[in-house]
Amino acid sequence: YRRLSSKLLDLVVTPHVLGEVPTEPVSATTETEAKTERQKVVCYVLQNHSRSNALVVDGETRRLNLKPALDPLVIGTHQEKASVLFLQHNDENNLLNPPPHAFPPRLIKLIEVLQANPELDIELVPVTVLWGRSPDKEDSWFKLLFSDTWATPSTVKQLVNIGLHGRQSYLEFHEPQSLRDLVEYAQKHYPNLSPATYIVSTLNDYLDRQREVVLGPDLSDRRNVMQSVLKSRDVQEAIRRESIRGKISMLEAERRAIGYVNEIVSDYSHSAVRFADLALTRLWTQLYDGVEVHNFSTVRELAKDYEIVYTPCHRSHIDYLLLSYVIYKRGLMVPYIAAGDNLNLPFVGQLLRGGGAFFIRRSFRGNGLYTSVFKEYLYSILSRNTPLEYFIEGGRSRTGRLLPPKTGMLAMTVHSHLRGRAKPIVFVPTYIGYERLMEGSTYVGEMQGKPKEAESIFGILKTLRKIERIFGKVHVNFGEPVFLDDLLKQHNAENVYIEKNDDPVPPAVSEAVNSSANAILENINRAVVINPVSLLSIILLATPKHTLDEEICIKQLEAYRNLASNFPYDQRTEVTPLSGKEIIAYGLKLKLIKRVQHALGDIIAIEDNQAVLLTYFRNNILHAFVLPSLIASLVEHNGKISRADLSNVIYTLYPFLKAELFLKWKSSELKEQIEQYADALVQSNLIQQDDEGNLISSAPNTEEHNQLVVLATPVKQSLERYYMTLALITQRGSGNISAKQVEELSHLLGQRLSVLYEFNSPEFFDKALFQSFIKVLTQQNYIRTNDQGQIEFDDNFRQMAAGAQLVLDEVTLQMLQHITTFTDEELKEALEAMASQQAKRRLKRKKA
């Protein structure tokens, strides 16, 4: 078997020998020499158990006329089957306290032979075997995927290594070491340990240093951090509590902790990052038209003095790879990324781990051991000043708007910082904008009520199969940083110190966490990139049939672009440099719009089945135009309105819009912005102003009025949602409906509204928007909840609801009034149907 394996290996493997070739140990030739020179034999030392590596070493030792590695090792009267010693075996299980058999049995026997025979010695020759070139020099992405790393390869990967890298394998014999000298040193300096402990540790460290020269340092947390996490005081205490709580042995509780660590930790490797670099470079150049990056200089400056936590918005699964790619290409360390455990799929999960991903469960409330392990691991990342990345929204946005923040990771980051401050922490909000989405059709289905599908390899392949090779550009814009220490000071929490993982967090720290979350989301929106697709979307979706005369469309695009350029939402906001005509050509190229030729002038229309999807890109930039849109809407609807009335209505609506769209302005800054935008619309002739300062709508059927109507439309669906919910609460009466029921019914009515009146907008299906609205109603004291959980309100609420006539037209108000009117019996049936549907979905998810 060995001979056959060796011959087969010789056909595909030609190792390159590095360094000097060792000489055979000198044998004693006279009786005098024999007394002073111990009899030595050679034993080759390999770090990991690998038959193929042993065969390669055997072949080279025979070729170089050295002692063959697979010949029997004979020392005195003792004989071993081969002259190879493996330091690590596949059956070792990485427990905190390895059992005795974790040491190589052959090493134990050889030590016993030397102790019984003082005249004998063994020369241990450490050998390094590497498959493939250095990751920095490899240009084949497939070979990089299987190039040698610090991780011990599986049998399958080793077979692939042999096939791919047989002609580019490397072997190096290192300086021989006396086993007897190692034993004597161990007995002298570590008398309480088995000599095997010292010898295995010393040789492992030695071979690690040799591999590091070629592969670079081992950055994998799976091998380097696991033990420190498990041995930490907090995790050991959690293991003890788990043992008591679960009535299991300490060993079993320890095994659970080890399982959690293996489930969570990153397995970073340079070859995986290089593989991702080559593969993603190909992706961005072939599938997309490249990646445009703005304001990266901010990050480069911060990296010198701060622990960086990247907090991007979450649009697509591609986000995980995109930001790391951008950072890597600009010479900074790739961040460790917190990824949902739904992505811990076979093969895909390992690739993500190799690029720095670590996995977190969606919920682990009530699991004290998992919580302790995860917090300790996060603390280890921050204490090493390793950059970190997570999505503050928790999941991918299905509507294109920012989702309300999930503060779990943020709170644990602050908690770790307060345990022990290494560097000060800075959050880097990052805007990611696409011009087409891989998951677009999936998002539309989910927002229209289809259950969310669990991630799977099959699902990923299914998505890839549907991909068209026209995706436009990807935009990455780094926003204004958020400094944690500044926010802690604002809430008088800068001197708080937390000693243990399970220490309670003072209210001031919780307030600082919430402030940080909102600041991050507001700064993501400040860094918005207004690209050609989002401009086309916000304009064409504002028309009744999603069509415009081409010349009018060009003028409308120019008007929006000029407004965004002359009155930018923020200094970090980026606006496309393309002209209106170029934007239309770009939309045609991406197959999002079509040109309908006509004798009286060509018409630009949204492509079939693209309207709902384009709401996503409209919503990406809605916050940048919502204030001028609201002004235009109020002026157009009322025909004439004083600046004072305009401001009063906007001040009433602003808290709801701010919470929904994470707008940057404080209430104290709002008046200046209203005046600025109103003046801009007057200067552009979209609205008029009389001698008393009243704002007047342009005359109907004029070009200016048509442009005003288009500008006024984007905000209307938010207003319709608000007043639909207000009408529902008013119709049920004070004390007759709970907040939860309002959220559920508003969501249901939104779906019905969309079907009956063709409101093609996914946000009518988004429960988070209704939850946000109810929350702000409570904060603004329009409603309150009684002891039975029912909503109560007074004349203040009724007066605010009556203000709808200043905002919406009569037809829309009647429609909303009609759709929110139903009997107690109808209400009961609707709630029961929703509860049944939710129970079925929960059961389906549980089975999956």
Briefly describe each language-model feature range.
Residues 1-848:
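Membrane-interfacial terminal anchoring regions of lipid-handling membrane enzymes
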